[in-house]
């Protein structure tokens, strides 16, 4: 979740549909009343795991996410405000993992296949300078590290 300067809360969620045995796209919900009520989930057409959003002073929203199952990467994307569409033209890849063959498409097999979990958990936030800091973990079966990148949006 993130809270903008007006007190509006936004939530980004990644879920698994156990009936269809598939991961769903990231969905966004918004609350304008301190979390008492929420908008209907909005499908962002982005798959996999979202980060904490960076909410810039000018209203822009920067969302990082793990593209674990398609490109095995971590990406960021920007929208002009909480209600705006995230435009693919703003998408930037900040980390690429060595391609790993997935042994299963079933949830249990995916969770057991630890190779695809050797990177992730991005977290985005705004620095005092106005730049966005995104940090995440990445590595291999022998060593994990924390990585970070600072981004400037104009």
Description of each model-found segment:
Residues 1-154:
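Asp-box/BNR beta-propeller blade signature and adjacent active/binding-site loops
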């Amino acid at each position: 979740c993130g809270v903008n300067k007006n007190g509006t809360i936004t939530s980004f969620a990644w879920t698994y549909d156990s009936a269809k045995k598939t991961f769903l796209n990231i969905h966004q919900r918004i609350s304008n009343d301190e979390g008492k009520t929420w908008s209907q989930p909005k499908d962002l057409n982005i798959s996999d795991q979202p980060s904490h959003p960076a909410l810039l002073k000018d209203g822009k929203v920067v969302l990082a996410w793990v593209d674990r199952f398609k490109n095995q990467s971590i990406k960021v994307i920007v929208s002009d405000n909480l209600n705006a569409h995230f435009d693919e033209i703003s998408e930037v890849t900040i980390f690429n993992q060595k391609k790993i063959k997935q042994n299963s498409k079933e949830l249990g097999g995916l969770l057991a296949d630890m190779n695809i979990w050797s990177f992730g958990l991005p977290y985005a936030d705004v620095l005092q300078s106005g730049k966005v800091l995104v940090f995440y973990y990445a590595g291999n079966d022998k060593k994990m590290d924390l990585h970070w990148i600072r981004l400037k949006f104009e």
